[in-house]
A protein has these predicted regions:
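Short basic helix-loop element that most often maps to the first helix and adjoining turn
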Residues: 10-29
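Short, charged recognition helix plus adjacent turn
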Residues: 57, 65-74
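Recognition helix of helix-turn-helix/homeodomain-like DNA-binding domains
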Residues: 31-45
């Protein structure tokens, strides 16, 4: 089984890129540090539930969308 942190990070990258956003733009819009988001996207950082909700709101998707495997429609 692939590490859930890696899958989450891949899904986050996918959703961010669909908007044409850089990590910097996502960081600015969500209020999270770019370095933290980079670690999450690489599967190196754990993410708190509160931050999943912040990212979902920022990306305009339900929080559950961030937990789906990469390659899923949103």
């Amino acid at each position: 089984m692939t590490d859930p942190k890696i899958l989450f990070g891949q899904r986050l990258v996918e959703l961010r890129k669909r908007l044409g956003w850089s990590q910097e733009k996502l960081a600015l819009e969500s209020g999270l540090a770019r370095s933290y988001l980079g670690g999450v996207e690489r599967g190196q950082r754990n993410i708190a539930v509160v931050n999943i909700y912040k990212l979902a709101e920022t990306l305009n998707v339900p929080p559950s969308t961030l937990l789906e495997p990469p390659g899923q429609p949103d």
